[in-house]
């Protein structure tokens, strides 16, 4: 666990000492409303590469905006997908991509859904192939372990739920995290079935999900960090 914390600190130090970024493009749609709570119009970013093009994803109170950023001299919005829930009540959206699909969630609104967008033919076309609340209505964050085709939905129906993406357009629930010491998973980073969970006021956990392939299985706890100086709210992490 100490090694994990050291790595995170070193990564933070590296990025803090990196060269300053240069602004090459700015986009702001003034027709979009800000959230009622914080007046934030935009709420998330993601990126992916497909068909030799680079794309940026921006979440807003209106939905999902996809930009082709391949040519820095000609950046443009190539796709927009309206959210199932839109407007001033939206504070958070989140995204991850896998196997030619973009997965989109929202953390607010009774009408919110999981959206799956076929992005395999961008920048020419896209298609929303799934837009439903049958699996879950809301999630604060999602993360996809692309090496194992598993989607982790944080603060959704439970503290965290895991879905198989063996069929990328039809996720199947394979785990509901059942740990009485964890009431909320705020964010997650997962690599090769090792899940690093940021559990808010419940601290930090590391689980092994390699044997989790059905709803009856539970992951193995590898490490737990619940008390440390200036702990605060364990919000998010990355490796």
Positions of the model-derived regions?
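Bacterial Sec-dependent N-terminal signal peptides
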Residues: 1-21
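Feature marking well-ordered beta-strand scaffolds used for ligand recognition
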Residues: 18-239
